[in-house]
């Protein structure tokens, strides 16, 4: 009976999403408690699914009366269970921050729960068409959440993401259609068998199908050069939304790419189509370098870490394309670790903005003196992003690099060595901007401004987004530069009147909400702890890797 947990992980948040709107007709402020209860339930369900996978291995559930491959199938294995746990934990943790930072309102929490349900569905679905359905649920709710700030800048960023995301979803759907024409099935496992038995890896329909699916998911993941929606969306979204989107949305799209590549098309398809794998490696390598360089050019903290994501997902893309077991292990570890790191970093940036109005590196002078816990957590998470051992960021990069070298030594040519070199160069760029931030935290001489309120918390549900105003022109260009008009006018966040829920000035270090600080510190502790779990992670993902490389 444990297989019923799989539909529950999806149904609970989606059904709960109707309640804030329905009960909101009679009661105010019911959205947060409903969302908290629902996401807590999802955490429990995800933990139970992971425990079942640990004890008994992969299991599945057929939805409805039709059995697979005709019916809808949900599947839990080591990879999907790990991603589901990440989704559940980050979703619940984000609510603790949104309670004080916003956005607020019943419609926001309904959209948030739909997002959680869509992400859970992407992690568990066993067929390609339902992957598209859940991908669309995630996309539509993300567009709404990014625009929850109700400013012109956030609305523009949301519209930009909507256009790009729609193109990506359309390409994915066309690719699935081609695969269906070639195989006559949508079930992932059955399609893998039909490709081998009927179509073959050299079938033009199969090749076009994979190319279109990869292109569509690359838009969703935000690989260079189709990354342009991401910096604006991350910068202009409310802080709580940025944290959950950065940690989960691109992460689940990258998970979908791993799942489609290795469960449906298999490693043999990659070996038989050198042109496709070469193109993937070129795009991934370019994304690694371009994202790192553009991140190093930024002053706005959210924009800097947004470009960093372009580089980090490029590493995951390279790990997928290398078709090497060690590299794929690194890609999966980096997928989970990067999600946690970016959640913590954006949560830390939002906490600084809420407590002190800090949004740019130059405004973060001596943050360690006035906000030692917040600054320390951001510094540790930043070093994890660089890949300093023993962080989880180091583990992922190490496995990818070792796998890349193994690939070259096994006769794959110089591509693997090139990937390892690009990752090394990217690490140097990452160190440059993280070190610049840490230098401002610990060695600059001017204290924090200490502003609170609407502008300080930029985009927490009121009518401002980092002082951007209602002019979308400030975010129209994506040339790797900051486009924050307010910051250019003043150079620092001006103190404003406090709002309800904002912390009041005191002599206590880190005058920020205790809940958000606690979540930040726990996230930091988890990322550091995972850095010591290299063998445990390799053992956990071992059965999945053994299956796909058998």
Residue ranges with predicted function:
Residues 2-96, 100-110, 461-479, 483-488, ...:
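Transmembrane helix-loop-helix hairpins at membrane boundaries of multipass inner-membrane proteins
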């Amino acid at each position: 009976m444990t297989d019923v947990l799989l539909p529950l992980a999806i149904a609970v948040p989606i059904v709960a999403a109707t309640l804030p709107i329905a009960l909101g007709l009679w009661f105010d402020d019911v959205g947060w408690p409903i969302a908290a209860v629902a996401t807590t339930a999802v955490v429990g369900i995800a933990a139970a699914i992971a425990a079942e996978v640990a004890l008994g291995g992969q299991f599945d559930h057929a939805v409805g009366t039709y059995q697979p491959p005709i019916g809808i199938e949900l599947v839990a294995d080591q990879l999907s269970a790990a991603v589901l746990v990440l989704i559940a934990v980050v979703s619940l943790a984000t609510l603790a921050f949104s309670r004080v930072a916003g956005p607020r309102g019943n419609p926001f929490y309904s959209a948030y729960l739909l997002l959680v349900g869509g992400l859970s569905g992407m992690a568990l679905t066993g067929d390609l068409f339902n992957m598209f359905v859940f991908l669309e649920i995630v996309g539509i709710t993300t567009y709404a959440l990014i625009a929850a700030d109700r400013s012109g800048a956030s609305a523009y960023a949301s519209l930009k993401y909507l256009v790009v995301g729609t193109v990506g979803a359309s390409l994915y759907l066309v690719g699935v259609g081609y695969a269906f024409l070639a195989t006559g099935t949508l079930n992932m496992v059955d399609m893998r068998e039909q490709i081998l038995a009927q179509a073959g890896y050299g079938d033009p329909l199969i090749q076009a199908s994979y190319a279109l699916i990869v292109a569509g998911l690359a838009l969703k993941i935000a690989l260079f050069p189709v990354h342009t929606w991401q910096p604006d969306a991350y910068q202009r979204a409310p802080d709580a939304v940025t944290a959950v989107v950065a940690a989960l949305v691109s992460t689940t799209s990258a998970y979908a790419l791993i799942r489609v590549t290795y469960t449906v098309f298999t490693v043999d398809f990659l070996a038989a189509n050198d042109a496709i794998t070469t193109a993937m490696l070129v795009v991934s390598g370019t994304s690694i370098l371009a994202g790192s360089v553009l991140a190093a050019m930024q002053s706005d903290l959210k924009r800097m870490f947004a470009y960093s994501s372009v580089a980090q997902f490029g590493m995951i893309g390279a790990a997928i394309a290398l078709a090497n077991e060690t590299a794929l292990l690194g890609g999966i570890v980096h997928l989970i670790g990067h999600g946690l790191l970016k959640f913590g970093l954006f949560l830390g940036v939002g906490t600084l903005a809420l407590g002190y109005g800090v949004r740019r590196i130059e405004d973060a002078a001596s943050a360690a003196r006035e906000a030692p816990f917040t600054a320390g957590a951001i510094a540790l998470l930043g070093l994890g992003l660089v890949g300093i051992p023993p962080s989880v960021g180091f583990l992922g990069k190490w496995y990818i690099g070792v796998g890349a070298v193994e690939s070259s030594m096994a006769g794959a040519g110089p591509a693997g060595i090139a990937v390892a070199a690009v990752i090394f160069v990217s690490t140097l760029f990452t160190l440059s901007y993280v070190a610049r931030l840490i230098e401002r935290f610990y060695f600059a001489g001017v204290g924090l401004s200490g502003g609170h309120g609407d502008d300080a918390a930029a985009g927490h549900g009121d009518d401002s987004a980092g002082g951007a105003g209602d002019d979308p022109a400030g975010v129209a260009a994506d040339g790797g530069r900051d486009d924050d008009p307010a910051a250019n006018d003043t150079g620092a966040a001006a103190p404003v009147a406090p709002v309800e829920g904002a912390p009041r000035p005191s002599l206590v270090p880190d005058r920020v909400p205790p809940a958000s600080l606690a979540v930040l510190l726990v996230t930091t502790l988890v990322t550091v702890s995972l850095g010591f779990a290299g063998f445990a992670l390799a053992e956990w993902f071992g059965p999945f890797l053994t299956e796909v490389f058998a």
